């Protein structure tokens, strides 16, 4: 990086003899002072271009010989700081930050697909990801093969020599199905196919995706990381097993697609990382207690939360995600009218489409994030009119429970 002043030239911080815990790493830079003046937060570099010392210096930057920023569409010190902070919390070889989760998904798929190739994925997938695969990549000659990922035999039959990647969500939204990552990785890797996982619903700090066979994670950092829904963002966490992710992203797609994270978003999300662990533990604990209480409400026909011991995915979820199940759950009422009525009467829980805000949120998936699909398509995806999705925030569980009860009984 260019020297701003000679204040220790970003002197390294003192490191502990043992590896620090993730909660500490999330608040420490671990590699240098972030600012020439000793600021405790990385400054926001709101500029489009960066000056070079010589013409050769400029050439070396543009050809990748030195890691200095040349243009904010592909590199910015504030964003690089955020990427390095995320990398320090994982075993990743590379981390790339984008301006949304969907941009991260599109980028990682474009690292592998081309005409004649196919993507093997779940028949339970986020609506915009489905649209990306069918409506954007489909006309370019890329086939999408949707299978039940719980049926490992079906997955094995779907993967062939033309498969570009296996793509999944670790917990489907809103079906709450949990993918067996290790089993799916074995199937994919037998054909030298990468396993790409959208891990938005469980923070990457809570489990070791690489140890389970995941080759790259995509994350909507808009969710848990942004801390209060303050900024859009997405991440690719690349474990280096398929070099084309780094090569194509760094030297092609960032230049050509214009999907790089903004400096302000990187600043906000670096700050969000510092409190991620504490917020997640509180939100997931509240989600579990609320789910337990709602099981006793007669008007609620089903509570779907993988942290409940009677959930069919409980053991797999606990094994993969370190005895945690996240802050999203769904409830089913008698019919659509009852579900809509409950949502309309909520006073504490907000009607909004985001996930993992500091505030709790309620959504009717069938009429919102899956509204573009026909009734028969939604039923095939197990998205039902009776379902309400709840994203649990930092409110007290007593207030959330009372809000739902009052909405049912009023």
Residue spans of the language-model regions?
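PLP-dependent enzyme catalytic core of the Aspartate aminotransferase-like
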Residues: 7-10, 15-19, 134, 140-143, ...
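Short conserved active-site loop signatures built around small residues
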Residues: 20-45, 236
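Conserved PLP-enzyme active-site core in the AAT-like
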Residues: 26-33, 94-299, 304
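Glycine-rich beta-alpha junction loops
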Residues: 31-33, 46-52, 223, 275, ...
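Conserved N-terminal alpha-helix of the aminotransferase class I/II PLP-enzyme fold
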Residues: 49, 54-103, 128, 132-135
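Short Gly/aromatic-enriched secondary-structure transition segments
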Residues: 59-65, 346, 404-407
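Conserved C-terminal alpha-helix-loop-beta "cap" of PLP-dependent enzymes
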Residues: 302-388, 392
């Amino acid at each position: 990086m260019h020297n701003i002043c000679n204040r220790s030239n970003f002197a390294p911080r003192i490191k502990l003899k043992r590896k620090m815990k993730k909660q500490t790493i999330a608040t420490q830079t671990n590699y240098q002072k972030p600012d020439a003046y000793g600021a405790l937060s990385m400054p926001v570099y709101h500029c489009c271009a960066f000056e070079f010392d010589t013409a050769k210096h400029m050439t070396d930057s543009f050809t990748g010989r030195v890691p200095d920023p040349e243009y904010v569409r592909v590199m910015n010190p504030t964003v690089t700081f955020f990427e390095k902070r995320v990398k320090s919390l994982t075993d990743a070889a590379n981390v790339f930050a984008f301006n949304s989760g969907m941009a991260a998904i599109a980028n990682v798929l474009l690292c592998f697909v081309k005409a004649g190739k196919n993507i093997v994925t779940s028949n339970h997938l986020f609506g915009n990801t489905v649209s990306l695969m069918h409506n954007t990549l489909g006309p370019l000659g890329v086939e999408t093969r949707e299978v039940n990922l719980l049926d490992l035999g079906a997955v094995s039959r779907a993967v062939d020599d033309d498969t570009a990647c296996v793509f999944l969500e670790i917990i489907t939204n809103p079906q709450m199905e949990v993918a067996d990552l290790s089993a799916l990785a074995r199937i994919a890797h037998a054909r030298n196919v990468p396993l790409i996982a959208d891990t938005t619903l469980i923070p990457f700090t809570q489990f070791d995706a690489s140890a389970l066979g995941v080759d790259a994670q995509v994350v909507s950092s808009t969710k848990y990381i942004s801390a209060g829904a303050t900024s859009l963002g997405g991440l690719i966490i690349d474990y280096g097993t398929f070099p084309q992710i780094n090569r194509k992203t760094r030297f092609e797609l960032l230049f050509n697609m214009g999907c790089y994270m903004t400096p302000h978003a990187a600043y906000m999300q670096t700050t969000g990382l510092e409190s991620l662990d504490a917020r997640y533990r509180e939100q997931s604990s509240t989600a579990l207690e609320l789910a337990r209480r709602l099981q006793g409400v007669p008007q609620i026909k089903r509570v779907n939360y993988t942290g409940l011991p009677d959930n069919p995915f409980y053991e797999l979820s606990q094994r993969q995600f370190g005895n945690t199940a996240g802050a999203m759950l769904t409830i089913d009422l008698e019919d659509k009218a009852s579900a809509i009525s409950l949502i309309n009467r909520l006073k504490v829980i907000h009607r909004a489409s985001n996930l993992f805000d500091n505030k709790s949120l309620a959504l009717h998936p069938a009429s919102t994030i899956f509204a573009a699909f026909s009734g028969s398509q939604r039923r095939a995806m197990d998205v039902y009119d009776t379902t309400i999705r709840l994203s649990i925030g930092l409110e007290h569980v007593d207030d959330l429970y009372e809000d739902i009860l009052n909405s049912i009984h009023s």
